[in-house]
Amino acid sequence: MAVTVQMLVDRLKLNVIYGDEHLLSKRITTADISRPGLEMTGYFDYYAPERLQLVGMKEWSYLMAMTGHNRYQVLREMFQKETPAIVVARDLEIPEEMYEAAKDTGIAILQSKAPTSRLSGEVSWYLDSCLAERTSVHGVLMDIYGMGVLIQGDSGIGKSETGLELVKRGHRLVADDRVDVYAKDEETLWGEPAEILRHLLEIRGVGIIDIMSLYGASAVKDSSQVQLAIYLENFETGKVFDRLGNGNEEIELSGVKVPRIRIPVKTGRNVSVVIEAAAMNHRAKQMGFDATQTFEDRLTHLISQNEVNDD
């Protein structure tokens, strides 16, 4: 997926100083950003023209110390046909030579009042999200108490119905049926809906319902980190399920491992409440509060006491 410069401008509210006509035609194909420091000195051996060029205070100060002729020569060599745009931070003044180089090469000049480091982080975050490789998985992604929970299971098990019940209980729907997941880094997985399914939920016997229209903006979310996976499966006599919570089952999506809990489903069981409890318990474990460990410690202490009493 490529990101147009127009998409970047709209998302980060950047000011377009020059090149409105190039915003849709210029595409950003890499999440890497270039801070052209050495390039300002004329060293272009490892220059990556396909990257978005970000000019901060240091680059700007060095640029402004040059003569007009040298300034134009450097900028003209920086601005190549592969270059999507140049972004100037801190609302720094745009030199005339930058306008000339941009006009000669068809490069857009963008400006932001944000400090360079913050702007760099925002641009990188957005580009990483847009350009990361997506994997589609079947399930329902919910935001439960601020935690992204991916609900999976066999077809007809009641995933969407459970999602609807969770929405009624005050939680937020991220995606139903098809969840597009991508890795932000080696340990962070994010999920979002397919655009055609955004805010929609399918309930057998009812059809497709618009959660945004029925329950309001507070009931939906555009994307969420995936921190826990729940797998719903039919209860079968004799089938072993984790009763202590000390299982370490995981699934791997887009190269990121996510802890998974299997929950048996049978008539009369309030699955949405169980999922709420599972999400809260997982968060408690992340904070260092482990009920299973507490139980095991108490059991060990009780056994030790009984052994002393027997002696």
Swiss-Prot record:
It is an enzyme of class 2 (transferase). Pfam families: Hpr_kinase_C, Hpr_kinase_N. Its cofactor is Mg(2+). It comes from Streptococcus agalactiae serotype V (strain ATCC BAA-611 / 2603 V/R). Belongs to the HPrK/P family. Homohexamer. This is HPr kinase/phosphorylase. One of its GO terms (biological process) is regulation of carbohydrate metabolic process. GO terms for molecular function: ATP binding; magnesium ion binding; phosphorelay sensor kinase activity; protein serine/threonine kinase activity; protein serine/threonine/tyrosine kinase activity. Residues 201-210 are annotated as: Important for the catalytic mechanism of both phosphorylation and dephosphorylation. It comes from the Bacteria. The active site is at residues 138, 159, 177, 243. Catalyzes the ATP- as well as the pyrophosphate-dependent phosphorylation of a specific serine residue in HPr, a phosphocarrier protein of the phosphoenolpyruvate-dependent sugar phosphotransferase system (PTS). HprK/P also catalyzes the pyrophosphate-producing, inorganic phosphate-dependent dephosphorylation (phosphorolysis) of seryl-phosphorylated HPr (P-Ser-HPr). The Walker A ATP-binding motif also binds Pi and PPi. ATP binds at residues 153-160. Residues 264-269 are annotated as: Important for the catalytic mechanism of dephosphorylation. Transmembrane segments: none annotated. It catalyses: [HPr protein]-L-serine + ATP = [HPr protein]-O-phospho-L-serine + ADP + H(+); [HPr protein]-O-phospho-L-serine + phosphate + H(+) = [HPr protein]-L-serine + diphosphate. Both phosphorylation and phosphorolysis are carried out by the same active site and suggest a common mechanism for both reactions. Its EC number is 2.7.11.-, 2.7.4.-. NCBIfam families: hpr-ser.
